[in-house]
Amino acid sequence: MTTEAFDYYIPVRKSEIVSAILHHESLSAADRPEMASLIRWLALLFHMEFFATSEHIKELYVGLNPDQKGDTPLETSHAQRQVFLEELDKVLIAANFRPLTNDEVEDADSKEGRLRSEIKVKTGVFSRVHFYARGLRDVETEVDKWFGLRRRKMMIPTFDHVVFAMIPGLNASKKDVKRAGLRQGAAYLQLFRSIPMADLKALYPNARAQVSWARKAIIAASTVITGVPLLMKIIPALSVLLLVLAAYLGISGKVEEDSLKKAIASGTVLAAFVGLGLRQWVSYDRHSLRQHKLLSDHAHSNKLNTNAGCFDYLVAASEDAEVKEAFMAYALLYLHGEPMKMEALDDHVESWFKARFGKVIDFEIDDAIAKLERLSLVIREGDTFSAVPLPKAIENCVTNWQLLSDNIAHGGVEEDKLEFFEP
């Protein structure tokens, strides 16, 4: 599953989009200052709107934060956890993250990722697990080949960002929960960058990388090849060794010098056999530790933030995505100069973006139009839309700003109670 248009994520900075619009060949020099003013107003409006969102979700998370004092289970209810997850879902979808299904996570072959090894996870430790991702693209990555003797480059489907939300099960084994470093009753959030789709399981705190069957076969084969000749020498002389031991323990009679020499030789071979076994076990353990280190390096070195620290980034990402969508939809509709149907505007935005930035996106036109209608920046006539003239658009933004600031100042920060200007 690889496609550049995997989700609604716009993989270009807002400043680049603004610069491209302000230098559009259809934008006159007289309109350029007003278009620049409009983007600033849009940024202010969505910042104000998402201020309410930020305060609301942070308040919901206070009782669920595992980083609060103590290490005892948190006394939280199912309803409390459910409300938080629903609000988190809204924020992430606004930031163009897409929830991944269990099948997508389970079917991802960990042997096709950067780790190139099987990953085992005790999922019974968790009562709720949610993966969100955005920006799937093929990334050229160097991976080990021939047991690390060579490296080769290959294209691996990789997400730009991944959010992992998990809640430990209240009925899970306390030993397993403690081993995973979790706290029951809490909600955990982890934000990652540049994670291969095949390595999603590596993000679990109790993930364990397995030594490959090929490596196990090599260790087993070398043990057999070296150990069988030693074992063949030990077995015939084992009776002599036992007799010598019995004599020294006083169980049997005296030991002849010839038997003693044979016993010493047998003991030496036996020690070599035991040493071989220990060496092979150390070899297996070393490869196992190497896999765990790679697991930690690849997954957790790409961790951007955890728990309460994720909210500022995610809310800012949501705000940024909303501004980019609304500004592109309005600006390109305005520069087109004629009313357009929603589907035509969608194609127009995607074509312009590909021509300007060389990237394919799946523009979320219905959401963009809904935002512009809410802010009174477009006029609907039947199934067509036209942009409000720039001076009027700025005037409507000013009015919306006043309404939003008054609502938040006097009515609290609940997002569903925010009002907008309707001409």
Please annotate each region the language model reported.
Residues 369-383:
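A short, conserved structural fragment
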Residues 1-223:
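Basic, amphipathic N-terminal segments
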Residues 293-339, 361:
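Short alpha-helical segments that sit at the start of domains
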Residues 358-370:
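Soluble catalytic regions of membrane-associated enzymes that act on cell-envelope
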Residues 337-356:
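Short acidic, hydrophobic short linear motifs in intrinsically disordered regions
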Residues 384-389:
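Minor-groove-contacting beta-hairpin "wing" of winged helix-turn-helix DNA-binding domains
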Residues 213-298:
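Transmembrane alpha-helical hairpins and terminal membrane-anchor modules
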Residues 390-423:
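Short, amphipathic alpha-helical interaction segments positioned at domain boundaries
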